[in-house]
């Protein structure tokens, strides 16, 4: 009996070390950033079982077998659709401003489609204005409405949007709604999901959370896009979820969420529509490719419209493109670079690009919320401040609530707005959407919004920052080490 237990004991020990060795080898064989690999190895060696389970659950990008097969299957038809769209030559921009030229070329070559011109844009900075405009557009919709949000939180004006959407479905408008399972858990637990389906709306719970499949698909991979398309020529996107800030996370202690949305009319709605159709097919297996822009029903203002490129990121989309786009934008800056983000945990490359811009004389500003709803990200962000301040970057801490806007403005002319945070999750993992706008007029509008944020912010004093307590420095470095995993 003793011999039996001895053998079992040795087999358990051998299996334990083989498991650690196997996961270690898997980490080393994967093409990943060195800081990320080192952080995972540290966790596995300090807390082996916890680390191994965490790595198998969250360490690799698993879309899931069924979704991965759908993603592969959809590309031939999507590529054909993109090729056919190129016949609509009147919608594509041929020239860009010097500051935007490199970025637009990058996006065109990586995505197979160029930027589109003749779009009308309106920046909306108040949640009431966003929802009122959206309700008006829904009420006027004639053919189809597609929506995707990370969070839909019942309450306040979000319920008014839901009522208008159900009314549209009842009068014959084809309505589709895709919501992230984790972000919109309150919605799916409420009566609204059943009410919408009964009204004729196709409601899809994207990336459904299922603990039974935790090792088959990465659970923290989320559908983070916020998009609305109406009749294939009106579109919305930006940082705002379908929530009324007066009813959302009131007990978090960070104040109301401050967001930015863009309302657009023009060919960009078609570019966003193909992104939505890909998401819909990956999630449901149903193909819903949008029609090409119809010049007979779409007002086209070539002379006065804005030029926009749409960048989609996430599994199944061009890898690393949004990260490349941010690097290209930072290196293109010659005079001004202003970045707004709620979560700042950049890659080493992006941090280097930002610091280099400041060191070569560019006026670089980063606007962050002073209070953050994520304790981990808040402390990890602070770990980058010393290097940024030393390079000459201005750091503004917004004090008027949780600044949730995601925007970049380069030299007052090249703008990036959308759903992408400057953190690892947005850059490498989630389904995201970003608009790249080449227009000085829009840049002026965005600059006015950013100036308003700065007026409600406190400029971080480099001298006072260096005098912060030792315990804060230790906490910052600890969270910094694990920043590749956040």
UniProtKB/Swiss-Prot annotation:
<keyword id="KW-0443">Lipid metabolism</keyword>
<keyword id="KW-0997">Cell inner membrane</keyword>
<dbReference type="InterPro" id="IPR027379">
    <property type="entry name" value="CLS_N"/>
</dbReference>
<feature type="transmembrane region" description="Helical">
    <location>
        <begin position="38"/>
        <end position="58"/>
    </location>
</feature>
<feature type="active site">
    <location>
        <position position="224"/>
    </location>
</feature>
<feature type="transmembrane region" description="Helical">
    <location>
        <begin position="3"/>
        <end position="23"/>
    </location>
</feature>
<feature type="active site">
    <location>
        <position position="406"/>
    </location>
</feature>
<keyword id="KW-0472">Membrane</keyword>
<dbReference type="InterPro" id="IPR025202">
    <property type="entry name" value="PLD-like_dom"/>
</dbReference>
<comment type="function">
    <text>Catalyzes the reversible phosphatidyl group transfer from one phosphatidylglycerol molecule to another to form cardiolipin (CL) (diphosphatidylglycerol) and glycerol.</text>
</comment>
<keyword id="KW-1133">Transmembrane helix</keyword>
<keyword id="KW-0808">Transferase</keyword>
<dbReference type="Pfam" id="PF13396">
    <property type="entry name" value="PLDc_N"/>
</dbReference>
<keyword id="KW-1208">Phospholipid metabolism</keyword>
<dbReference type="InterPro" id="IPR030840">
    <property type="entry name" value="CL_synthase_A"/>
</dbReference>
<feature type="active site">
    <location>
        <position position="231"/>
    </location>
</feature>
<comment type="similarity">
    <text>Belongs to the phospholipase D family. Cardiolipin synthase subfamily. ClsA sub-subfamily.</text>
</comment>
<keyword id="KW-0444">Lipid biosynthesis</keyword>
<feature type="active site">
    <location>
        <position position="411"/>
    </location>
</feature>
<keyword id="KW-0677">Repeat</keyword>
<keyword id="KW-0812">Transmembrane</keyword>
<dbReference type="GO" id="GO:0008808">
    <property type="term" value="F:cardiolipin synthase activity"/>
</dbReference>
<dbReference type="Pfam" id="PF13091">
    <property type="entry name" value="PLDc_2"/>
</dbReference>
<feature type="active site">
    <location>
        <position position="404"/>
    </location>
</feature>
<dbReference type="InterPro" id="IPR001736">
    <property type="entry name" value="PLipase_D/transphosphatidylase"/>
</dbReference>
<protein>
    <recommendedName>
        <fullName>Cardiolipin synthase A</fullName>
        <ecNumber>2.7.8.-</ecNumber>
    </recommendedName>
</protein>
<keyword id="KW-0594">Phospholipid biosynthesis</keyword>
<dbReference type="GO" id="GO:0032049">
    <property type="term" value="P:cardiolipin biosynthetic process"/>
</dbReference>
<dbReference type="InterPro" id="IPR022924">
    <property type="entry name" value="Cardiolipin_synthase"/>
</dbReference>
<feature type="domain" description="PLD phosphodiesterase 2">
    <location>
        <begin position="399"/>
        <end position="426"/>
    </location>
</feature>
<feature type="domain" description="PLD phosphodiesterase 1">
    <location>
        <begin position="219"/>
        <end position="246"/>
    </location>
</feature>
<feature type="active site">
    <location>
        <position position="226"/>
    </location>
</feature>
<dbReference type="GO" id="GO:0005886">
    <property type="term" value="C:plasma membrane"/>
</dbReference>
<keyword id="KW-1003">Cell membrane</keyword>
């Amino acid at each position: 009996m003793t011999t039996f237990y001895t053998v079992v004991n040795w087999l358990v020990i051998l299996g334990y070390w083989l498991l650690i060795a196997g996961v270690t080898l898997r980490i080393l064989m994967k093409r990943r950033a060195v800081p990320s690999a080192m952080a995972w190895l540290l966790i596995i060696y300090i807390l082996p079982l916890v680390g191994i389970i965490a790595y198998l659950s969250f360490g690799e990008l698993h879309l899931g077998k069924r979704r991965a097969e759908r993603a592969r299957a959809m590309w031939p038809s999507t590529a054909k659709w993109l090729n056919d769209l190129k016949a609509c030559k009147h919608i594509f921009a041929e020239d860009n401003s010097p500051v935007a030229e490199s970025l637009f070329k990058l996006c065109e070559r990586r995505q197979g489609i160029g930027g589109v011109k003749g779009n009308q844009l309106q920046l909306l900075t108040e949640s009431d204005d966003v929802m009122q405009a959206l309700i008006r557009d829904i009420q006027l919709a004639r053919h189809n409405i597609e929506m995707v949000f990370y969070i839909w939180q019942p309450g306040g004006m979000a319920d008014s949007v839901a009522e208008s959407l159900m009314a549209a479905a009842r009068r014959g408008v084809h309505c589709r709604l895709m919501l992230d399972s984790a972000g919109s858990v309150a919605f799916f637990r409420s009566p609204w999901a059943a009410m919408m389906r009964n009204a004729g709306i196709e409601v899809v719970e994207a990336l459904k959370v299922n603990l039974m499949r935790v090792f088959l698909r990465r659970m923290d991979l989320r559908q983070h896009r916020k998009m609305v398309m109406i009749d294939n020529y009106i579109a919305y996107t930006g940082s705002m979820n379908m929530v009324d800030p007066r009813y959302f996370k009131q007990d978090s202690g960070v104040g109301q969420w401050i967001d930015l949305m863009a309302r657009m009319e023009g060919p960009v709605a078609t570019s966003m529509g193909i992104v939505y159709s890909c998401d819909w097919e990956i999630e449901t297996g149903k193909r819903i490719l949008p029609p090409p822009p119809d010049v007979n029903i779409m007002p086209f203002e070539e002379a006065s419209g804005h030029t926009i490129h749409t960048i989609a990121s996430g599994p199944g989309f061009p890898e690393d493109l949004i990260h490349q786009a941010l690097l290209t934008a930072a290196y293109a800056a010659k005079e001004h670079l202003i970045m707004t983000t709620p979560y700042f945990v950049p890659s080493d490359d992006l941090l280097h690009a930002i610091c280099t811009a400041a060191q070569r004389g560019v006026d670089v500003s980063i606007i962050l919320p002073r209070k953050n709803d994520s304790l981990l990200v808040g402390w990890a962000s602070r770990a980058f401040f010393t290097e940024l301040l030393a390079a000459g970057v201005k750091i503004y801490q917004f004090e008027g609530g949780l600044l949730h806007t995601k925007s970049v403005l380069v030299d007052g002319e090249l703008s990036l707005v959308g759903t992408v945070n400057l953190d690892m999750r947005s850059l490498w993992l989630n389904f995201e959407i970003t608009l790249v706008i080449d227009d000085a007029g829009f840049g002026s509008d965005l600059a006015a919004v950013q100036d308003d944020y700065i007026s409600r912010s406190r400029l971080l004093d480099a001298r006072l920052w260096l005098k912060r307590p030792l315990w804060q420095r230790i906490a910052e470095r600890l969270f910094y080490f694990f920043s590749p995993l956040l």
